[in-house]
């Protein structure tokens, strides 16, 4: 497990935008994501399977609160997403809501 507590996808962003890109260290199979202050926001996890690939694909997430599966994160909490075979991961904010943070906690 790689501890990525310092990797920030978003930190109090206030407009729609694309996050920083996380390279998949050691070809991890799952990423744990912490989202705070994001009630009412719409976030999408995206990935690429090849470093040369230009298309981004949506990755579904599992809420670690109720184990619900979704293509979007719409509230604060802990989430896990499968990333086996994915080389780059990013988040896209589809809603201009300020004051939220999104961190990658770990890659297993």
Can you describe what each PLM-predicted range is?
Residues 1-2:
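Activation corresponds to long, low-complexity, non-globular regions
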Residues 40-58, 102-105:
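Short, surface-exposed beta-strand/strand-loop-strand elements in extracellular ectodomains
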Residues 34, 48, 78-80:
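Generic structural signal for short, flexible, solvent-exposed coil/loop and linker residues
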Residues 33-35, 91:
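Aromatic/hydrophobic beta-strand junction motif of beta-rich domains
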Residues 7-27, 59-108:
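Beta-sandwich interaction modules
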Residues 28, 37-42, 96-97:
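Short proline/glycine-enriched turn/loop motifs at strand-loop junctions of beta-rich domains
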